[in-house]
Amino acid sequence: MACRCTQLQDTIDEVATQFYSSIHYLSSHHDFVPLPGQEKVSDSKVNPISAEELQFAQRDLAKDLVTKFMQIDTLINQLPGISTAPKHQLEKIKKLQNSIEEKQLERKSLESENEDLKLQLAKRIETFGRLSCVLFQP
């Protein structure tokens, strides 16, 4: 599962797409209303639907947008640290920094131990090579 920030960004992208799609749908399916004293105009790119269908579509699109915004709100509330006071967040950061420093020291110690073991192994291989040359010489 993706992290909360990624989910939030994906949901924001989805709501932006929904906004665009809603505006495009409504602008291509509305009916033209003439201004007083003018004739009703038309556009070949617009395929008008009835007023009832348009209202239903508007409500449906609005519900979808509200649902998406509720998902965004839920994701924001689930972000780490949202319900934590800044003081507690700083304490947690300090603990994590100390933990990182301890792990770095442990890593250096283990790297040093690893180098020592490599040297010991190299010496033993060298000793074994000399002994096998002496023992198996004709």
Curated annotation (Swiss-Prot):
Coiled-coil region(s): 87-128
Top-rank taxon: Eukaryota
UniProtKB keywords: Activator, Coiled coil, Nucleus, Transcription, Transcription regulation
GO terms under biological process: positive regulation of transcription initiation by RNA polymerase II; regulation of transcription by RNA polymerase II
Record field: transmembrane: none
Protein name: Mediator of RNA polymerase II transcription subunit 21
Single GO molecular function: transcription coactivator activity
SUPFAM superfamilies: Mediator hinge subcomplex-like
Keyword Nucleus in annotation: yes
Similarity comment: Belongs to the Mediator complex subunit 21 family.
Database matches in InterPro entries: Med7/Med21-like, Mediator_Med21
Places the protein is found: Nucleus
Primary role: Component of the Mediator complex, a coactivator involved in the regulated transcription of nearly all RNA polymerase II-dependent genes. Mediator functions as a bridge to convey information from gene-specific regulatory proteins to the basal RNA polymerase II transcription machinery. Mediator is recruited to promoters by direct interactions with regulatory proteins and serves as a scaffold for the assembly of a functional preinitiation complex with RNA polymerase II and the general transcription factors.
Subunit: Component of the Mediator complex.
Nucleus keyword on record: yes
GO cellular component assignments: mediator complex; nucleus
